[in-house]
Amino acid sequence: MKISGNMSKYNKKISFFEILSQIPSNREDWYIFECDAVGKAPNNLTMSEFEDLVLNSKYGYQMSWDELLKFSKEIEDINNLIVVSSTSPVEFEMIEKGAEALQVRVEIYDSTTWEIEFYG
């Protein structure tokens, strides 16, 4: 099942946290594969350092659901983002193919649209 929308509603920008609020609370591991954003990065990293770390992580940058929600509240604006929940670590290429381990995929494109896909 897929749901999607625009990043602005009634001339107001939708936050990353608001997008995540469409996903039921869970205990899954989440992996960030792309992050081009403005805001506060986790673990006292600069956003530039965090973006580089994410891009250079074979299996994405791992977070719990609670960590992802906390991170989402620190983000002011997102240009591009790809984050997935998965029962086991997956490589980026497997996201494109829809690996069996995938449970949810969240993408934000060019600061304009977002999409959530639920697998299984």
Residue ranges of predicted features:
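Ser/Thr/Pro-rich, acidic low-complexity intrinsically disordered regulatory segments
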Residues: 1-3
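N-terminal interaction modules that seed assembly of large macromolecular complexes
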Residues: 6-59
